[in-house]
From Swiss-Prot:
GO biological process terms held by the UniProt record: L-proline biosynthetic process
Protein name: Gamma-glutamyl phosphate reductase
Key word Ribonucleoprotein present: no
Function comment: Catalyzes the NADPH-dependent reduction of L-glutamate 5-phosphate into L-glutamate 5-semialdehyde and phosphate. The product spontaneously undergoes cyclization to form 1-pyrroline-5-carboxylate.
NCBIfam families registered for this protein in UniProt: PRK00197.1, proA
Primary gene name: proA
InterPro entries, alphabetized: Ald_DH/histidinol_DH (IPR016161), Ald_DH_C (IPR016163), Ald_DH_N (IPR016162), Aldehyde_DH_dom (IPR015590), G-glutamylP_reductase_CS (IPR020593), Glu-5-SA_DH (IPR012134), GPR_dom (IPR000965)
Top-level division of the source organism's lineage: Bacteria
Taxonomic classification: Bacteria, Pseudomonadati, Pseudomonadota, Gammaproteobacteria, Cellvibrionales
Organism, scientific name: Teredinibacter turnerae (strain ATCC 39867 / T7901)
Catalyses which reaction(s): L-glutamate 5-semialdehyde + phosphate + NADP(+) = L-glutamyl 5-phosphate + NADPH + H(+)
Amino acid sequence: MTVKDYMQQLGRQARAASRDMLAASTDDKNRALVAIADAITANRELIIQENARDLENGRANGLEPAMLDRLELTPARFDGMIEGLRQVAALPDPCGEISDLKYRPSGIQVGKMRVPLGVVGIIYESRPNVTIDAASLCLKSGNATILRGGSEAIHSNQAIAKCIAAGLESVGLPASAVQVVETTDRAAVGELITMAEYVDVIVPRGGRSLIERISNDAKVSVIKHLDGICHVFIDDDADLDKAFNIALNSKTHRYGVCNAMETLLVASSVAEKILPRLATAYAEKSVELRGCDRTLAILPNINAAKPEDWDTEYLAPILAIRVVDDMTAAMDHIAAHSSAHTESIVTENYTKARKFMALVDSASVMVNASTRFADGFQYGLGAEIGISTDKIHARGPVGLEGLTSQKWIVFGDGEILN
C-alpha cells in the first residue's frame, strides 16, 4: 500500500469514527478516558522500555539535548499522562452546551450549540506524552483524531496507541477514533495536511521549520504557534524578591519548552540591584547570559548580545538580557521581538500592571507570575493540545473548548417568514 493510500484509509476511518464520537455520551467518553488511564498504568513497564529504545536510537542518531529531553518519559511525565487523562475525564463536557438563547420578535428562539470540530490531525515531534494529551482532549471534545508523531518517538507512540485502542474498545467506542500514523515516511505529513475531505483542522507542534511548512502547504485550517520568545519585565516598582524568583523560575525550571523565558527586560532604576544577584543564580545553573551594552556595564563578564539574540527561541540554558528605561520601552521591545506567546511583568503598581495587560498583544499576559504557568494544565484545561498565537478560532493554550466550534440553533412553533 502506498503512503497516499494508507493515509486515505486513515482519513476515511477517522471521518466514520467522528460520527460515532458525535453520538457518544459524556459517560461513554469519560469511561473511555479512565479505561485508557488504566491500560497505560498496566503497561507502564512496556511503555518505558519502548521509550528507552527511542532514547537509545536518538542518542545514536545525534539528537540535540533539547530534543532528547522532550523525548524522555520521566517518571513524573509518565504519571502526568495518567493524571491528565483522569483530569480530562473530570472536566465538564463542552459538547451540546447551549448559550445565548433568546427570543426574536418573530417568535423564534435563537441560540448557539457547542459541537466538535470533527477530525483533528495532530503533527508533533519528540514528546510521546503529547499522544495522550491530544487523544484525551479530542475524545472528550467529541472529535476523532489522527496523530503523526516524530519518527524519533515511534516505538513509544506505538506502545501508547495500543493502550488507547484497548481503552476505547473496552467501552464500545471505535478504536479508529484515535489513530497513530505508523509509518515514518515524511510523505505521510504531506498527505495528512491536504486531506480536506477527511480532516477539519491540523495542529502542528514542533520546530519552526515544521510549522512553517505545514502552514504554507496545508489545505485545511491550522492552529499553531511558531516560536516561544517569552519575556519577563522587571519594573521599577517590582518587589525584587518576587522578581528574582520569577526570573529564575521562568528560565531554569525547564529549558526545552515554549513557555520558558528567553529575554529578560529590566528597568534601569533597579538593574544594579537585581542583575548581580540573578547573574550569580544563573551561573550556578550554568546559564549563559547575553546582554546589551547597559547590561554589560553591570555584568562585565557576560557575553555581548547580538541583534539576532532578541529574536531567538533558545530552548537551551541561554538568556538574553536588556536594560530598558521604563515600562514603555519594555513594551516597545516586546512589540518588536515577541512571538506573541507569553509575557510577564513584575510590579507592585496596579495601574502599570493593568496597562501592561491591556497593551501587550500576546496570547498570555501575566502579572507577578512565572511564564511557565502558560500551560493548559496550569490554566485548568486539563492537558492541552497546543498553544495558539493566532487570533482566530483559538488563542493561547488550546483545551476542550478550543477543539469545538458553535453552530446556530433555532426553535420555532410553526413560525414562517412574511
